[in-house]
A protein has these predicted regions:
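Glycine-rich phosphate-binding/hydrolytic loop that grips phosphoryl groups
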Residues: 1-2, 116-138
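Glycine-rich phosphate-binding loop plus the immediately following alpha-helix
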Residues: 1-25
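Long, low-complexity N-terminal extensions
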Residues: 11, 72, 90-91, 129
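Conserved, helical-rich catalytic subdomain that frames metal- and/or nucleotide-binding sites
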Residues: 18-38
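Adenine-nucleotide phosphate-binding core of ATP-dependent small-molecule kinases
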Residues: 38-88, 123
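Catalytic cores of soluble, metal-dependent hydrolases
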Residues: 66, 72, 91-95, 106-112, ...
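Glycine-rich phosphate-binding loops at beta-strand->alpha-helix junctions
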Residues: 79-108, 122-123
Length: 138
């Protein structure tokens, strides 16, 4: 984000991304196939930044960066549990404050048959966990 948007302030990136259109930067299944594939809707991402060009707006790029990060996290979580029974994932940390979480993760839930949970105060859960770990050792 620092190179493309000249900022690394996640609040500013989120605000810029609110006006972005992900279909202007990400190649979607519907762009390469005229009908849904089995278990793969036309709005699913085929290629992150696959449609980005010099005409992409700052807002579209910001949204693309956020989607790339969130889809990578979600995809890694799903892949890590592929051969096991885990189907529920709890998301914590500052990234859960991105409004795009409520776009990206529900779509991934439908595609992969999993559930992503964002608990209250998710942005503080990492610090709470560290404090509890410290207290349990001392």
């Amino acid at each position: 984000s620092r190179l493309l948007l000249k900022t690394h302030d996640f609040r500013q990136i989120a605000a810029i991304a609110e006006k972005g259109d992900i279909t202007r930067v990400n190649l979607q299944i519907g762009d390469i196939c005229n009908r849904p594939l089995p278990d793969l809707p036309v709005h699913a991402t085929a290629s992150l930044f696959g449609k980005a060009d010099s005409n992409a707006s700052q807002e579209d790029i910001a949204k693309g960066i956020i989607y790339m990060v969130l889809q990578t996290i979600g995809g890694a979580a799903v892949l890590s549990a592929l051969n096991g029974p885990i189907r529920d994932f709890v998301l914590i940390g500052n990234l859960t404050k991105f409004p795009q979480c409520h776009e990206v993760f529900p779509n991934m839930e439908k595609i992969y048959g999993v559930r992503f949970h964002i608990p209250p105060y998710a942005e503080y859960r990492t610090a709470i966990g560290a404090a509890l770990a410290y207290l349990s050792k001392h």
